[in-house]
Amino acid sequence: MKKVILSIVSIIMVSFAADAKKENKAVTYNENGEIIKTGINLGPLPVVAFDADRGFQFGALLNLYNFGNGDTYPNPKSQWYIEASAYTKESAINSYKFIVNYDNKTLIPGVRMSICTGYYKDAALDFYGFNGYQSNYDMSLIEDNLFFSDDKSGENLAEKFENKGKLPKGFYRHGRDLIKIKADFTGEILKNFYWEAGYSFSWTKIQSFIPKGYTVFPGANIGSDYIGTSLYDLYKDWGIIPEDEANGGVVSALKAGLMYDSRNVENNPTEGIWAEAHVIAAPKWLGTSHSQYKYSATFRQYVPIIDEGKLTFAYRIAYQGTIDNSAPWYTMPFYTNMGIKADNDAFGGYRTVRGLMLNRVQGLDVGFYNAELRWKFIDFKLWKQNIAFALSAFTDGAHVFRGYDMSFTDEAKAKLLLKDPVTGVAKAALYDKFVFDRKDGFHASAGAGLRFIMNQNFIVAFEYARCFNKQDGSGAFYINTGFLF
């Protein structure tokens, strides 16, 4: 926490230093009493964050805002976001990412351009299966079939389990490398009503997770390597994940949509409506490995309860569906965004449903919601910066409305037994333990948060959420940036 506070102080000081280098210019205020920012505002700072799903995050980022002559403040005319960071969990670096985003409203007359690029590496990405509660999450079942190795890694894990009751979750993990590039364009049709068009490219490579120091379900793999198995590997064995999709692939997609946006402030809205509807087409002739066609709709509203943004009720309702009966499994965790933000990774976690385990909800058609009260309890000026603190109380939820085909067909069973009768029987017997004959239920959570807000754009969030069903996880704490919506 001390590191986070030091980071906030450093960003204020850097912004103040940048302002000090400008010519002595009279400070001007808008109708809300805020200092109108002009020119380039820099926000370099170390990344110090925490995500319950990925662990402690460290690295560096740069926020660069161009307010020009200030006539559009608090909305910048253009902005850059650059980040290089990594996550460490259990004293090991499990994932890292490199991101460069650029947004410009003036380069092309009448058109807003947003470009997002990123490389993401996850050595141990959460995977809990498809269709929500149809996939059983049961750590007690893992505990009964987990064996620690005799080496130092195994001894350390065994000690943690004995002293803290902490079980390794490698059974519910796989590895992933991901490259994402997108370019989106927005233009006004009528006041507050816009067209949207864009192109996105992603390359995904999936690998099995190889645990160190322990084995899960060793009876399912009695080979000389004795590495046990994982849910991802079992899904391949059961034929739920097709062979040609198992290792990932390329998605090359065209996007089109409409947007209504009457927000008063883009990054910290206190009133207005922001609604979007999109169609996404990724045919094979465009270079896609496995064609897919999707649609999405999102409605967000910000209702002022007390004037001047003191108290706001905000909510988001979102739905994403598949135009067909199938889609590549490795694309299901993503929810399409258009604009400066990259596509949300996973239904569950900080950007979609707080408290819910990352990737817990996956299906062909998925919906989710967020509802929260935001109370800006103090605001002041410090070193020529507009500073505010806000509290929030929220509830989030998600549901799979149409599921992915989870059948363990006779053909898949015969193929599994033919490959290796001994391990095949063991793996086939595990199907009924992890895939239930039921539809998804409602996943929900509730929590609260605190935010530091500078110049209506740079926002640091501290949030805690807890799920109502242990199948979705327990409590989750996050330190991150911005509002969810």
Spell out what each predicted region is:
Residues 46-48, 60-64, 100-104, 181-187, ...:
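Residues on the lipid-exposed face of transmembrane beta-strands in outer-membrane beta-barrel proteins
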Residues 41-43, 57, 95-97, 176-180, ...:
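Transmembrane beta-barrel architecture of outer-membrane proteins
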Residues 42-44, 78-82, 111-117, 193-197, ...:
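Transmembrane beta-strands of outer-membrane beta-barrel proteins
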Residues 21-22, 28-40, 68-78, 106-113, ...:
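Short loop/turn motifs that connect adjacent beta-strands in outer-membrane beta-barrel proteins
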Residues 34-42, 49-250, 347, 471-485:
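Gram-negative/organellar outer-membrane beta-barrel architecture
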Residues 244, 254-257, 265-385, 401-403, ...:
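C-terminal outer-membrane beta-barrel translocator/porin domains of Gram-negative envelope proteins
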Residues 41-52, 75-90, 98, 273-283, ...:
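Transmembrane beta-strand segments that form the barrel wall of outer-membrane beta-barrel proteins
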Residues 49-51, 63-65, 85-89, 116-120, ...:
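Outer-membrane beta-barrel pore domains and translocons
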